[in-house]
Amino acid sequence: MVVFKNIGHIITKALALGSSTVMMGGMLAGTTESPGEYLYQDGKRLKAYRGMGSIDAMQKTGTKGNASTSRYFSESDSVLVAQGVSGAVVDKGSIKKFIPYLYNGLQHSCQDIGCRSLTLLKENVQSGKVRFEFRTASAQLEGGVNNLHSYEKRLHN
């Protein structure tokens, strides 16, 4: 399973390589409409998060009839093995504000790659016009934010 940390990952790691859908549980966690209780820590509003493969999710309703244990074929296991985490994520507000960010992010990702649509992107990947390259951790660090004392990365307004 691939973990999507931002909208660019959805394009490059999934849709460009042939996926027609993506799982975005962690990305949508923290929205008003997602399950979980709110809490405050160090002045930040957070929302509890249980990844589907976490022990908390597997134990929540017992192992029988539980989507989490079913997904990981653990319904009859007496010992559960975590394949996810529980924690807290920063409050993202309503999904009504977050979905336009995702939509625009998909458009910008396609434009950055030089394609006007997902269909064209997939065609260009298959034909070799768009190719992927491996970047070392050093290259990724070098390509990041440089020469700033501090910065803030906001997903959307």
From Swiss-Prot:
One GO molecular-function entry:
IMP dehydrogenase activity
- Protein's recorded name: Putative inosine-5'-monophosphate dehydrogenase-like protein YAR075W
- List, alphabetically, the Gene3D superfamilies matched: Aldolase class I
Q: Which family does it belong to?
A: Belongs to the IMPDH/GMPR family.
UniProt-listed SMART domains: IMPDH (SM01240)
One GO process term, biological-process aspect: purine nucleotide biosynthetic process
Give one Pfam hit by family name: IMPDH
